[in-house]
């Protein structure tokens, strides 16, 4: 039973991995921008994506400098990005400030879930690693358009 469950789960992980690879390959854009902390370094490295972020990793900082906001706003314009990414439970303040300093001021904020805030109640209600990463894939697809 254990071996069958492990094999089944590994198969689901492999399928999800293939979906990420296929999605990234299908878009000409390969850059995302996070107006927030950035806990997705391994994900972007694994799938060959470029990124810009207000903070490196899961920094404890909560206020981005003027220079950082200015740089990210210019990158958004330069790359023609239609969205700014945040993490779950973010106040989106930095992302909104970046957007307000872009040329068109019409980008969306999209949210990816790092799983760092997942509770036992979430798990009891059906939240799984696979379900969260599938939702993140859908967000990533929108961000790469």
Which residues make up each language-model segment?
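Extracytoplasmic metal-acquisition and chelation regions
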Residues: 1-145
């Amino acid at each position: 039973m254990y071996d069958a469950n492990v094999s089944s789960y590994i198969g689901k992980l492999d399928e999800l991995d293939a979906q990420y690879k296929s999605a990234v390959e299908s878009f000409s854009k390969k850059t995302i921008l996070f107006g927030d902390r950035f806990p997705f370094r391994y994900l972007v490295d694994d799938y060959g994506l470029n990124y810009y972020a207000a903070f490196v990793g899961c920094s404890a900082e909560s206020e981005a400098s003027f220079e950082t906001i200015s740089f990210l706003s210019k990158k958004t314009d330069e790359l023609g990005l239609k969205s700014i990414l945040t993490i779950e439970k973010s106040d989106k303040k930095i992302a909104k400030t970046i957007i307000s300093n872009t040329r068109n001021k019409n980008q969306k904020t999209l949210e990816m879930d790092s799983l760092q805030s997942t509770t036992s109640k979430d798990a009891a209600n059906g939240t799984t690693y696979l379900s969260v990463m599938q939702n993140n894939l859908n967000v990533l697809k929108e961000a790469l358009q």
